[in-house]
Amino acid sequence: MDGKRRPGPGPGVPPKRARGGLWDEDEAYRPSQFEEELALMEEMEAERRLQEQEEEELQSALEAADGQFSPTAIDARWLRPAPPALDPQMEPLIFQQLEIDHYVAPARPLPGAPPPSQDSVPILRAFGVTNEGVSVCCHIHGFAPYFYTPAPPGFGPEHLSELQRELSAAISRDQRGGKELTGPAVLAVELCSRESMFGYHGHGPSPFLRITLALPRLMAPARRLLEQGIRLAGLGTPSFAPYEANVDFEIRFMVDTDIVGCNWLELPAGKYILRPEGKATLCQLEADVLWSDVISHPPEGEWQRIAPLRVLSFDIECAGRKGIFPEPERDPVIQICSLGLRWGEPEPFLRLALTLRPCAPILGAKVQSYEREEDLLQAWSTFIRIMDPDVITGYNIQNFDLPYLISRAQTLKVPGFPLLGRVIGLRSNIRESSFQSRQTGRRDSKVVSMVGRVQMDMLQVLLREYKLRSYTLNAVSFHFLGEQKEDVQHSIITDLQNGNDQTRRRLAVYCLKDAFLPLRLLERLMVLVNAMEMARVTGVPLGYLLSRGQQVKVVSQLLRQAMRQGLLMPVVKTEGGEDYTGATVIEPLKGYYDVPIATLDFSSLYPSIMMAHNLCYTTLLRPGAAQKLGLTEDQFIKTPTGDEFVKASVRKGLLPQILENLLSARKRAKAELAKETDPLRRQVLDGRQLALKVSANSVYGFTGAQVGRLPCLEISQSVTGFGRQMIEKTKQLVETKYTVENGYSTSAKVVYGDTDSVMCRFGVSSVAEAMALGREAADWVSGHFPSPIRLEFEKVYFPYLLISKKRYAGLLFSSRPDAHDRMDCKGLEAVRRDNCPLVANLVTASLRRLLIDRDPSGAVAHAQDVISDLLCNRIDISQLVITKELTRAAADYAGKQAHVELAERMRKRDPGSAPSLGDRVPYVIISAAKGVAAYMKSEDPLFVLEHSLPIDTQYYLEQQLAKPLLRIFEPILGEGRAEAVLLRGDHTRCKTVLTGKVGGLLAFAKRRNCCIGCRTVLSHQGAVCKFCQPRESELYQKEVSHLSALEERFSRLWTQCQRCQGSLHEDVICTSRDCPIFYMRKKVRKDLEDQERLLRRFGPPGPEAW
């Protein structure tokens, strides 16, 4: 029952019941209201008794569990500081809120508040932390959900009570069996004056109805019933169009009270009540307050600070079976390692390793060992409640660690384990989630509820924010932190666990490192700070940023601005629509430019266009509306796409106001950042200016989202239309002014333009001159556009290689004309991740020789050497690995894909470790019979090494290297010559040696030995033929020398891996597929075995050797 029932908000709150009831099938007979209420009361009483029984069982389990940590085992540093002795009548309660949600519970009487009229009411719950690090839960009472609808013609005050009664009765009938609804569904219907934000109508506010409901979940049925129509005396059955009926209850509350995500809240003295006993949560301070008494501090000045939050990072290890990925129904959890950090401190204050069976001590960490897995799981659950983290992080905790722990505890019947949140008695449950978008494809994931704690899975953050070749923790740590980690295959973990206390210690160190790295990533990438600032800027709860899409952020800002002006957001049904023309790209003048190219960039182009031309929902004129409203030509504009909007002199748009606020706030934040010296405040300010920039740019995207809350094709297509016009005008202005006729040394030419920038060749020879002319041109062109549109000088490229649209490279100069900042590449294989590393490395190396060294001959020679090495099998396999994301099931792909077919084959070999949806699949292309499709030749790199499968080097040359190299060298060498020099010639006449062990004819062929000297086939098992026997000693020495070289190489690689794992005295067991050393070590080990086998053919030394 527990697994199927949706958990409620806390003790004493009955769970919700599914829609429908006893009388659904018999519409002719309806029970009286008294009979319905009587049946409901009996059901509620039964639920209450059942819940009390469950709570007693949980409480006894928890009391037994708390004994898992003896007083001596609990480090005092784990505990939060003791809460102060607050006097609610004299002292305010101030805290930074992290999460806001709501639950439904019996109303509580509060001083100064009217007596509650409902048995069950929605109560908002804000979790947070004080400046001293004390945890707080604030129950906010008295706020009810509401929405608007236009009053139908003829509707007057006399119809208010009738509409309230009829709608309430309709909702009650619709919600039969809803246990929480014990009073009227509609609390109030009021007449007010408002105006729709969609379109300029010219008539000002009109009559609207504000409908207040008893519960948030009644919003959807109320909206549906109103759209169907409600019978009213004298008005017939009018249909009502809902406004703001799709706004989340928490967003509604935050908008109305001017609360933004992660800001500081103040409960004034004398306005709140502390709960000394009977608390519903594990928080140290628990308060009740009326919603109208909460004071919200805007995140500015001293209120920008971040409370000393407790961040917990953890990782688990499981003992799987050979060849099978761990399953929670069968495989035990053997270790759980946790690290705790107080935000703002440089080092974790807590390092804890909980292990199954004894483990040797670990310096700097506390080790707790258990003989029973049930005790281990219960101890970690108890530890979570003792340590009480505000933020929980890790790597893939959302899809593996947390679901595994909960499922395993359920299998072992550990009763108190799932109580991981802050609400007493509320279990953490797992639900499946699926997300699909055009950019990311489909991602299946799990969601674990943990009320009161923010979950930040670093894997999910990186998947959403960064485009990487691989997303394993090892690859990500190397990319961002510059450090590697030992990666132990799940099959080896069981062997370490079954060893002794030292092998278990090694496993615990590995597990601690896996918990430590996500914490480092969280800090290095400023994930928490940036997310908090984004929540503050957009006004949504922190949890929404991590689990919801982009649109809710703009909706929140739109609602806040609209509320100040009496405007309402309509509920728009969208199913996708027509597309529109995107930004302009000026046709590139391809080539290699050995002169400086100045780049001029429009600052915040799309937001600037929307502000300059007052483009908004509120200013949009429908076709013919300008004439009907009697507007003159100077009161509205016609955009390049033919759409019409009123000017700011008639009405200032909401979107331009929002954008002005965001960009001016960003300007202030950047000015403060320039002066600030405190590193923590610098982090906050940097996160704030970034959040403001992203938010401003997302407003345009919100209007263009065809399946969205409020799409408006007229706005989005007008913005891109103005953008195209501006790019073309900029080109014309630059090429008209900077000419020989106007006194300049050379006539300027715009060689390329893309969306918001143009690349200009002024014909000067020095970077300093190009910078001066670029600044002058930017200022001059800006004067031809309305404010705040501004063209800025951004950088100079010298030299510059322009290959095609969206593809170019050059040395970038932005501040100093005498030193380049970096080599900048766009759209080239040096920065793309859909090819093998060999391509990126070769393209980067070639560009460096072309652009930095100015050595085209050296670049050509290097490319030829790499091609020769490839064809002669001298390239390490790690450089040939291609990775592609598995975005959907095999059947959903239109054609056969190499990575999809390999994933299916790997699933047949080992279902547990096969890639799943959302994973990136690494593969190499192997040789096969002529005509075999490429998707059939994909193979797992490790499988290729273990079975000595030959690589299809021609595929890598023709399909991976050829096009990128020709793109770079054709502008320099010429089209025909580049192909002849790079892809033909002596360096391509290399013979590869096939060494496969499986597949094809090799599976049926019988191997015969050859003479090591002359390669003649031998009839015996010796090393040399009779003709080479006089040289046997010389050949033997040569092979021994080769063996020594291989041993030395293997020793160097082994030592490097030992340094990475942190011990020079233990075997290397790392199997990180993202590390090139791993593939080298595997290859050299195999070469060593082959070389030793070859030397054994010489036989034992004869007597003459002694």
Swiss-Prot record:
Zn(2+) binds at C1011, C1014, C1025, C1028. It catalyses: DNA(n) + a 2'-deoxyribonucleoside 5'-triphosphate = DNA(n+1) + diphosphate. It holds the Pfam family POL3_N. Residues 1-28 are annotated as: Disordered. GO terms for cellular component: delta DNA polymerase complex. InterPro entries: DNA-dir_DNA_pol_B, DNA-dir_DNA_pol_B_CS, DNA-dir_DNA_pol_B_exonuc, DNA-dir_DNA_pol_B_multi_dom, DNA/RNA_pol_sf, DNA_pol_B_thumb, DNA_pol_palm_dom_sf, DNA_pol_type-B. One of its GO terms (molecular function) is 3'-5'-DNA exonuclease activity. Its cofactor is [4Fe-4S] cluster. Its main location: nucleus. The modification Omega-N-methylarginine is found at R19. A motif (Nuclear localization signal) lies at residues 4-19. [4Fe-4S] cluster binds at C1057, C1060, C1070, C1075. The CysB motif binds 1 4Fe-4S cluster and is required for the formation of polymerase complexes. As the catalytic component of the trimeric (Pol-delta3 complex) and tetrameric DNA polymerase delta complexes (Pol-delta4 complex), plays a crucial role in high fidelity genome replication, including in lagging strand synthesis, and repair. Exhibits both DNA polymerase and 3'- to 5'-exonuclease activities. Requires the presence of accessory proteins POLD2, POLD3 and POLD4 for full activity. Depending upon the absence (Pol-delta3) or the presence of POLD4 (Pol-delta4), displays differences in catalytic activity. This is DNA polymerase delta catalytic subunit. The lineage of its organism: Eukaryota, Metazoa, Chordata, Craniata, Vertebrata.
